[in-house]
Amino acid sequence: MNAFKKRIFLSGLCLLVIVGGGFIAARPDLYFSIKKNFTIFSEVFRTVSVDYVDEVDPGELIHTAINAMLGTLDPYTVLIDERENQELDIIATSKYAGVGLEVGARGGKVVVIAPIEGYSASRKGVKAGDVLLTVNGQKVDNLSLDEIQNQLQGEPNTDVTLVVKRYGIEQPILFNLKRQEIVVHNVTYSGFVDPDSTIGYILIRQFGQNTSKEVEKALLRLKKNGHLRGLILDLRNNPGGLLSEAVGTVDLFEPPGREVVSTKGRNPENNSTYYTSAPAVFPNGGMAVLLNNGSASASEIVAGALQDLDRAVIIGQRSFGKGLVQIVKPLAYNTALKLTTAKYYTPSGRCIQAINYTHDQDYGAERVPDSLRKAYETHNGRTVFGGMGIEPDILIKPEKLGLLQIALLQQSQYFFFASRYTADHPKFVSQSVSDSLFSAFKEYLNAEHFHYQIPAQRYLSKLKTRLISTDSIQAMRPINTLDSLLVRYKEHAFAREAPEIREELYLEILSRYYGQKGKIRAELATDPDVQSAVKVLDNHEKYDRILAVKN
């Protein structure tokens, strides 16, 4: 049997399972309804394809019909095309063949975000910030990001030619690269929060194949390198992944025989309960799990289990709330159907699905109201609620970005300035952005004609247009005064938002010299969620009080 058919997934990405043949114990009238309506559909499709006044594309008709049908269900039930199938395969195996490049769109250009250390692109000297011009002789201006990825990936031991433009070098640079098998690391960083700390930190990007083994290796490395007294597990912006890896990760922190998650659906074959099965690697030390609204599905399984078992303090923001299980059933021509078949439940019995897809034409999808949220109890008797994701034990409000910071990020100004700075400075040993560097950044923005509008200016501009059309000179005077005040307000934005801008600029430049790991290491010192976790892990009395530990 194809290995693809054996894989099990649960995620904001998907869950792959093998399902039995068709409808188990289905009612006879259901079979008749399926046959009747399929016959009607087939006749309509055949008639339209052959007799419609204009020539139609049968494939497009079918895809439109399928998407319309699935669109009446939930957003996770979808038809998967060949490209998406390849992406699922990467999640399932944590491997693909490529040159080791992360690329993305920045400021209207396709750029190298980061070369992956140890692979062809990194070895040959491709750098973060390089602007892609051609891939295998094709201009990137004519390609989508998916098409560029298709060009970079392929069979192992095959060639890729890449032409890039690098700041400070006049002529484009040609790279001849070789595709090779690339192992996707699900644990993107692990270490102590600072060199003198006994609190470890593990960042999990997704729950792909071998995640639990990667977490175990990270734990053993931390225990070997120092006295591991506490642990922070970072699941922020983790969309999910393999169900087995979520269970295997909880396995590392709980003794055998503890329930982790159960799934329940209309078909009894989709009902399962998963337990821990191996001796824990880190059974007793303090634990904190970081979540935000980008944490979904498999990451919510891990957080929900550790919360219900009173094994960890949950810190951050409420998680996404995806409590639906999908299977991926392979179809003809390398396509597949991702279909919701069940809901999952944490050990306390709660389902954390935040949106109720009722299929009611009058109401449709709606969030579960607070009045319908049911209370459950954790192992130690704490009250938790279902129906709205995983709620943190310690809520940390997300930091609000200023309008200037948002504009700088949206226009990739930090990114492109870092590329220029790196070209002119072979080393970077500073612990912060100096005044001279900050001034250089502002000069760069002026030279690039950096511009942005705040909402008040946009509204004022519309009002000006209306007043001009009425020739109301008197009304224009206060409008012009207000416009001048808004300009001055914007001019002072650099002073108001300077600390945050300096921090973001520092981290972007640092990543060019020390990679993403160096950037993450530096971020730990100022990350409010991490610092909150450190405080609670250092305060045993507060930690036990939150988890209702009975001494």
Task: Give names to the regions the model predicted.
Residues 1-5:
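Short, Lys/Arg-rich N-terminal segment immediately upstream of the first membrane anchor
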Residues 9-24:
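Hydrophobic membrane-insertion alpha-helices, especially the h-region
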Residues 23-37, 41, 45-53, 57-58, ...:
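Cleft-lining beta-strand/loop regions that shape enzyme active-site pockets
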Residues 52-113, 157-189, 524-534, 542-549:
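Extended, small/polar residue-biased N-terminal targeting/export presequences
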Residues 114, 143, 176, 340, ...:
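Short linear motifs in exposed loops
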Residues 298, 310-311, 315-317, 321-382, ...:
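Polar, glycine-rich mid-to-C-terminal structural blocks
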Residues 351-551:
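Conserved functional hotspot residues or short segments at active or partner-binding sites
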